Amino acid sequence: MPPALVDIPVDGPAAEVYRTSPEEGWRVIRTKWRVTGVVPGLIEGGGRASGYFTSATGITIYRGDAWPEENLGDAFIADCGSNLVHRKKIRRSGVELIAERPADEQKVEFLTSTDLWFRPVQFANAPDGCLYLCDMYREVIEHPWSLPENIKKLLDLNSGNDRGRIYRIAPAGFKQPGRPQLAHATTAQLVATLESKNGWHRETAARLLWERQDQAAAPSLKKLLKESKSPLARLHALHALEGQGMLREAELLTALSDTDAAVREQAVRLAEKFITNGAFPPALWTKLRELAGDPDIAVRYQLAFTLGEVRGGERLTSLAAIARQDAGSAWMRAALLSSLAEGAGELFTVLSGDPVFRATEAGQEFLRQLAALVGAKNSATEVNVVLAYLGQLNEPALAFSMTSALGEGLQRARVSLAQSGGAVAGILERAVKAADDGALPEAARVPAVRLLAHQPYAEAGKRLIALLDQSQPQAVQLAALGTLAKFNDASVGADLLPQWNSLTPRLRAEAVPVLLARPERATELLRAIGAGTIRASVLDSTQVKLLTSYRDATVRELAAKVLAASPASARQPIIDGYAPALSLKGDVAHGKKIYEERCISCHRSSGEGFALGPDFVTVKTTGKEKLLTNLVDPNHEVRPEFVAYVVETKDDESYVGLVVNETSASVTVRQAYGKENVIPRANIAKMRSQGQSVMPEGLEQNLTPQDMADLLEFISTAQP
């Protein structure tokens, strides 16, 4: 499923801002102290004191009528720390929204003040059509906790607590309109006000109509819905009728045929109230099915959700029509899947039989998701239908990947794919041959290797270990390692560790989390370290902490014994040893090579790499001294979003990494090389912070001061 939280600004959450007020002296000093490590605290904006969002607040959409119409729908965001108001234009991209600076405000803000006490914190759309701004007006706006004591004692944190202002932001030549008297308006006047271009007037009239519940409003509301030239008025009329229990099928049919997509979208949502025993009235159902081909994706998106309230096979035709048009949208796929409490197998049959749909990347992804849903529902009839199709599909890579998806769904239902019978045996036999066939392209072998996870380990284990050989393509090796990780057989660790010396650095980096995931594997790894066959340096600091605090007592005790022999040394002497690098001229080209060897698995730079830690472009202005400290001692100062967490599951697995997304149903843990593990909350036994950076210590090992100078130069010149 797509993430519940989506950042829509194209310039990111810490976007550039352009203040006209001078930087406060204390802010400059605090930033310098943080950068040099004198005081703890977040280092934002690459070590700059200002010039980026630090205190965004009061997000408000302009809905008035005093300003030019081009400003309708603009978002206004205050940054009280920078004494300014920022503006964003919002547009749709599919079902998502994108926010970007107006063309005429690329390097300036909508409103700024040179007054350091100007602290905009909130806005309101007012009855006069203007935007009102609340200025808290304080000398210091920062939370006391964010100020070092040596600075705090020089400031009066209460200065201005008897002040504050409200501004009206009005266009040139603005004339104050008459004061509205909506509280005393008649019902007919309130209905007429729904056509106002002023959002405050419309919304107030709508609220009063709902509060009065005057049934006499029905005729005028119905007329407004049919005849108004304002889409917003028609939208208000539609909801006013529904809110007063006066929305009938005739009015809904009118709204479903509206020329404005937003009205049609809302009408589809309200149509759900007309469902009886899983069915719409015939005329309404006919119209809704037509909307599967609506030219606006927002209407189709809402329809995809609404169809989930309907029972019966007829809805599948509409779901299939939407899928054919919109399967490329992850949001639309999620909407379609949410509507398949029943019928996933039937929809799979319809779409898999469409060669045009099946040939597209989006179509294949949706078919995989459908197969997984069929498995999770665990209907024997549907599972057999899918398997029968996959058994005769003459596209091996697609057949293997969809069978894997089916198997993963079955696992969620606590059922084994191998026990499903039917065509499974034949598909697995084909996968075994394809996995071993070096003549096949990687695109066919990788899904075949992954499918081996659904064989018993006694059959698949040796083959997967053999596929770790250096003669195999890296993609096949990684697929084999990832497949090994899915087995809970006690032999996995013992089988994997003898291959250690032949594993590439990339495979070793991915193999360590596999070995740490289960107690019996972690035990084997610790024994190998204790015996000297594997060096303790393969473990970073977060992994050492995981082992020494492991929930299994045997692992904890063994870790304390084995790892105590090589305690982490203090980092400051190492930092001091690299001090000459700060005065050496750096070679960017060589620095890039070091980045590719040591940093690319967790950091992005110039469009390359994986986003576990911060993008180098966001830290390049920190200064080389601070960069050196953070490279050698990553736990010197850790931003909260980069603190490592351990998630332990009820299946006795452990994951260590960054928690990058949380929903009511799952937690997503990101690890090196962009690997993400989505863990259902129902399967989480325990989740805890490690209290330190996800970045390991020791990455500087074997680097000379000149190497460090080259790496620092590369980071300092990073591009987006």
Task: Report the location of each language-model feature.
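Long, ordered, helix-rich scaffold segments
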Residues: C134, D156-D162, I169-I594, V619, ...
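C-type cytochrome heme c attachment motif
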Residues: G58, C130, R165, S220, ...
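Beta-propeller domains with acidic blade repeats across secreted/periplasmic ectodomains
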Residues: M1-Q189, W200-H201, W210, F280, ...
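C-terminal capping alpha-helices of c-type cytochrome domains
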Residues: A237, R551-S569, G577, K624, ...
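Gly/Ser/Thr/Pro-enriched helix-cap/hinge segments flanking short amphipathic alpha-helices
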Residues: S196, E203, R207, L631, ...
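Protein kinase-like catalytic domain
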Residues: A170, H603, I715-Q719
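Sequence context surrounding c-type heme c attachment/ligation sites in exported
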Residues: H143, A560, A568, K585-I600, ...
